Amino acid sequence: MQVSDTIIKQPQEKLLTDAALMQSLKEAIAQKLAPDVTNIDLKGIYPEEFLRDIGSLGAYGQGVSTEYGGTGRGVLPALKAIEIVSETCLSTGFMTWCHNACSWYLQNTDNPFLKEQILPQVATGKLLSGTGLSNPMKHFAGIEKIKIIATPCEGGYILNGTLPWVSNIGDQHLFGISAQIEGTDNYLMAIAQGGMQGLELKQDVHFIALEGTNTFRCLFRNAFISHDWVLAAPCDRYVEYIKAGFILMQVGMGLGLTQNCIDLMRRIDRTKQHVNQYLDDRPDEMEDELETLRLKSYRLAEAIGHGREIVSKEILREVIESRATASELSLRASQSLMLHAGAIGYVHGSVYDRRLRESYFVAMVTPALKHLRKVLASMS
């Protein structure tokens, strides 16, 4: 699998962080994302230009060390970037998470080729990236079997199998995968490229939301992947390095969506407060719960930092609890928003309709709410 030398050798620009990054993201969202949200939602338009633009600002390089093209600021500003994008569009917020997840995989590998040659391009958005770890995460939780087999061969592995849905990918996109090493009980993790020989990308389903996420079924048929592209083999310990950051950054999606639902409820209350006051999950009480989750997730993000360490069991438990709470708040906030809106919320394609559909994704994307509760039960 090859990546163009011209891409690898491009000079790195200085990325923004903290307040400067957040302000620049708000401006980019207002100018380039907000006008396209309806087309992203209803027509499945993929916002590639916006995704590349926020990469050049620093949306994907916060958890990446400075020596590999990032800012070295850690998971916290990455989570905040996902949160702020998700306030406007969960599809794009999800893809911001997908890309950050791939950056996180590369940040935590010991593979020098991936860290030195590929990570700087992913950290700045020159190479767009997704994550194919839904199946592996469910496998390691005892929910389903791994779907790819890796057969060792000279120089690497031959991959065969299928990943049902992988998001934010295309012919030139990168994404993480996991496979069982044939004849063993061991597993590997690696980086695949959408255009690699032996890989077919298929779009053959229509989703009720998040249509603009470039989500494909991935069919591997005798696809060769070299040792240069392997993140870890075996990958048991490596998964422990990436797990907490992978899960916690998803909380940003729930934070952003819930905040927007609250803001919309308050806007509706300007004319309907006299009747909406009798509803449950009113904006003020939702805001209090949201702020509690926000502060907790920010604290956990600071504890995780920029990786390279396995977090304590207590930190991991809090991360999983926070992710579950993000799902629950998203569902409650979007349902309350629909009830606050009334009949206008029932109009197809309205913002209220979209936020309700998006909220179910927060609760269903891996790790789904039922997955999280299963893991928490096993940790009791």
What is the meaning of each model-derived region?
Residues 1-11:
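Extended, charge-enriched "interface" segments that sit outside catalytic cores
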Residues 3, 343-380:
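Glycine-rich phosphate/cofactor-binding loops in nucleotide/flavin-utilizing enzymes
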Residues 34-41, 270, 291-325, 338-346:
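C-terminal helix-coil-helix/basic helical segment that borders enzyme active sites and/or dimer interfaces
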Residues 38, 46-56, 60-160:
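Glycine-rich flavin
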Residues 164-169, 247, 362:
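Glycine-rich phosphate/pyrophosphate-binding beta-alpha loops
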Residues 165-199:
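A short core secondary-structure module
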Residues 206-291:
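Glycine-rich beta->alpha junctions and the first turn(s) of the following alpha-helix
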Residues 251, 258-261, 265, 286-300, ...:
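Amphipathic alpha-helices that form helix-helix packing interfaces
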